[in-house]
Amino acid sequence: MLAAGLAAQAAAPRQTEADAYTRYELLGPETASFKIYYEITATTAGATHYYNPIRAGSTASDEAVYDAMSGKPLPFEVVTGAAARQDPMMARASDSMDYIKVTLARPVPEEGQGRIIIVKTYKDEKSYLRDPRDPKGIIFNRPLGIQRNEVVLPPGYELTGCNVPSQVLAQPDGRVAISFMHAGSGEAPLILHARADAPTGDAARPAALTGERSWEAPARQGPTERARLSERAHQDRDIVYFLEAPESHAFSLYHDYTEAQPGAHAYYNVVREGSTVSSPSAYVLDTGEKLNAQVMTGAQLAAAKINPGESVGASTPVVVIPFPPVAKGTSVRLRISETYTAPASYRLENGELVFDRSFGRPRNAVVLPAGWYLTDSSIPATVRELPDGRIRLDFWNDRPDNIDVLIKARRKQPN
């Protein structure tokens, strides 16, 4: 019986997750507390619960959980590690931790996602404290294991120190925030210093961002001020490229994209010049619902009186994916798959695989075809081997610009 139980436990799927993002709002320093908005996606197919560990040394209060798709509250309870282990997914739950056990709005679909937002307040006097050397200063010293984070200072505080390269972003109410992506392994050893020297209220509110472009870039190419000061870490579109045989010039890809704009009812992807597209498909990650996808030209869009949101040439192909209109306070996350053929971007040259492409999104990944080994990558990337032996490169770009990625690979020696 014991052997059978251990075998069943070993066969049970483990809790898996993706797309973690955390926003910390520092409350008044006298409270030693901060409010956390934790966005996380459950990815274990069939899962009906998600378990969020309560960090050791922190006291949690004011918890709430929401379904990101509908915006509706979700039921939850705080359980011990021993209680969490009753769920086969959590066989490795720690006795030293409590967990927030969330009941998901719907079972996670096969190859789908269950997106949730966990809100809680932590009190941790070791992480958030007054600066002993500065009577007006505060310190937020907290190693962060989540790779995408934002920390918002209390009203009236200016940022005086930040040891992790970060964006600095004024909030609409005048508070100052830092935002960063940590692409490496391990925790980001974040230490923030701030001082109560900034105004509050209307005097602190920033001017509205404009559409003006930088004088440094060509007038029609440079990003707008609004784009340059948008938060990179919270941008939710990530793309994975799967390179096929380089002689084919073809690569498939999928990109995940969340739409929360009320009334939005379609996605338009304008195909880059020099590329052709085929086999588009899409589905709703939240539910597994399949969506219709088609390729139309700019002329066909104009004839159908469809506005894709940007200027499109008459012969330019556009991938069009309609979906039910998004209601206010809700969102939908899509996975869109396509295959591109782009001889200028992907080719075999002098016996080498060459992939040369500009990436504008913060998170991009490239998977080499089977049988090839990596020799060059012009842009720093994390590299890992997939279970099937293919090599994956992950590019995280926390700057508000494109990265021009050049990858080269060679064939492996036959076994």
Question: What annotation goes with each model-predicted range?
Answer:
Residues A10-I54, D134, R205-V271:
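Early extracytoplasmic/domain-onset interaction patches
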Residues T22-E25, P132-A245, N350-N415:
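Intrinsically disordered, low-complexity linkers and stems that provide flexible hinges
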Residues G28-A32, Y38-G46, R55, R106-V108, ...:
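Beta-strand elements of well-folded, non-transmembrane domains
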